[in-house]
């Protein structure tokens, strides 16, 4: 088993990475909690594949278990779904010492974490991420949120789980689209902090070969996030590097109402578009844009900006959480494995993103 300890101001917790760990979660929890009441929040797709294994593990260890199952996808990450979760928690008479387990991808994790952070002013919760994207990124670091009609993750909090259990075996059931979705975030880590990730992905022929190294890949990504979260828990400085590609990605996702592009696909477009701009400005080393396009394309990710309303995209960026006063922080790549934070005035964002439109 690979383990990573996260140490932040409010608490410390462990990320445990092991094939087959899903079947032993009950055993691992029974000596930690006095309460034997658990609510598992999941989605209807994940429930079909993995609930039975988790359920057996919990029941065999003496826990009682209730299930809250939501519809899969970003469209469920809203206040209406959150209210239904609260309603179920009340119906199940969940108390502060009881436990929420988030079993699912990024949407389930964000929604479950925010519910746990606010219900009874905070109850225990555990992350069991089942998508590659959630395993390398969203299950770690304490950011939990729901979307509003005006943008992504606009209502949220910082609330760390008590533990994160990552079972790479669950990735074997991912279809190619969801695998590629997670690879968008994996490739991001390579470009912002660790070129060895890119070298490994370059050397692999296909998805099956990547899965042979997946524990090491997950460990590398989680270690990078641990370092940045511990240095900057509240996302006010260096942690913003994790948002490379995300400023554009969130705008793209919202523009298409979370239907056309997955999060990882939108991040891939955002990274590629931004790197093309900064390479032309001589901020980024020549050849980086083509290198990025090649590795993203290899893993089934889009690299071309869709034909969309440019002003609508810029307007959504103004609501981005990385904006401060009249400026926004944008993450740019200097070369593969090295990035920096640039500050741009909000009134200059359109010209920065679409210089060909400025005469």
Curated annotation (Swiss-Prot):
Zn(2+) binds at residues 185, 246, 263. GO terms for biological process: amino acid biosynthetic process; aromatic amino acid family biosynthetic process; chorismate biosynthetic process. Binds 1 divalent metal cation per subunit. Can use either Co(2+) or Zn(2+). Its cofactor is Co(2+); Zn(2+); NAD(+). One of its GO terms (cellular component) is cytoplasm. One of its GO terms (molecular function) is nucleotide binding. Pathway: Metabolic intermediate biosynthesis; chorismate biosynthesis; chorismate from D-erythrose 4-phosphate and phosphoenolpyruvate: step 2/7. Its main location: cytoplasm. Keywords: Amino-acid biosynthesis, Aromatic amino acid biosynthesis, Cobalt, Cytoplasm, Lyase, Metal-binding, NAD, Nucleotide-binding, Zinc. Its EC number is 4.2.3.4. Disulfide bonds: none annotated. It catalyses: 7-phospho-2-dehydro-3-deoxy-D-arabino-heptonate = 3-dehydroquinate + phosphate. It is an enzyme of class 4 (lyase). Belongs to the sugar phosphate cyclases superfamily. Dehydroquinate synthase family. This is 3-dehydroquinate synthase. It comes from Clostridium kluyveri (strain ATCC 8527 / DSM 555 / NBRC 12016 / NCIMB 10680 / K1). The lineage of its organism: Bacteria, Bacillati, Bacillota, Clostridia, Eubacteriales.
């Amino acid at each position: 088993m690979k383990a990573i300890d996260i140490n932040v101001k409010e608490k410390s917790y462990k990320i445990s990475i092991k094939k087959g760990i899903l079947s032993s979660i009950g055993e691992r929890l029974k000596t930690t909690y006095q309460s034997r009441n658990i609510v598992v929040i999941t989605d209807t797709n994940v429930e079909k594949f993995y609930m039975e294994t988790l359920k057996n593990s919990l029941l065999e260890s003496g826990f009682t278990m209730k299930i809250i199952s939501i519809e899969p996808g970003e469209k469920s990450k809203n206040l209406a779904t959150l209210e239904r979760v609260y309603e179920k928690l009340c119906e199940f008479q969940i108390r502060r010492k009881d436990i929420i387990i988030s079993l699912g991808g990024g949407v389930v994790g964000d929604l479950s974490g925010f519910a746990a952070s606010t219900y009874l002013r905070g109850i225990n919760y555990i992350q069991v991420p089942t998508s590659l994207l959630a395993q390398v990124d969203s299950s770690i670091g304490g950011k939990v949120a729901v979307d509003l009609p005006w943008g992504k993750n606009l209502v949220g909090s910082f609330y760390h789980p008590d533990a994160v259990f990552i079972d790479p075996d669950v990735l074997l059931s991912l279809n190619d689209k969801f695998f590629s979705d997670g690879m968008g975030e994996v490739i991001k880590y390579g470009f912002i902090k660790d070129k060895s990730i890119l070298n490994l992905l370059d050397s692999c022929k296909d998805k099956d070969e990547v899965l042979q190294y997946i524990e090491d890949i997950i460990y590398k990504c989680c270690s990078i996030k641990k370092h940045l979260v511990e240095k900057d828990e509240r996302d006010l400085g260096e942690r913003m590097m994790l948002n490379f590609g995300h400023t554009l990605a969130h705008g793209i996702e919202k523009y298409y109402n979370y239907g056309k592009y997955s999060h990882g696909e939108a991040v891939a477009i955002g990274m590629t578009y931004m790197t093309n701009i900064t390479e032309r400005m001589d901020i980024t080393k020549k050849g980086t844009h083509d290198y990025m396009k090649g590795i993203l394309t290899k893993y089934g990710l889009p690299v071309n900006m869709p034909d969309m309303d440019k002003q609508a995209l810029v307007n959504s960026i103004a609501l981005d959480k990385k904006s401060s006063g009249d400026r926004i922080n944008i993450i740019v790549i200097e070369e593969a494995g090295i990035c920096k934070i640039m500050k741009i005035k909000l009134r200059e964002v359109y010209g920065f993103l679409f210089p060909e439109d400025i005469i």
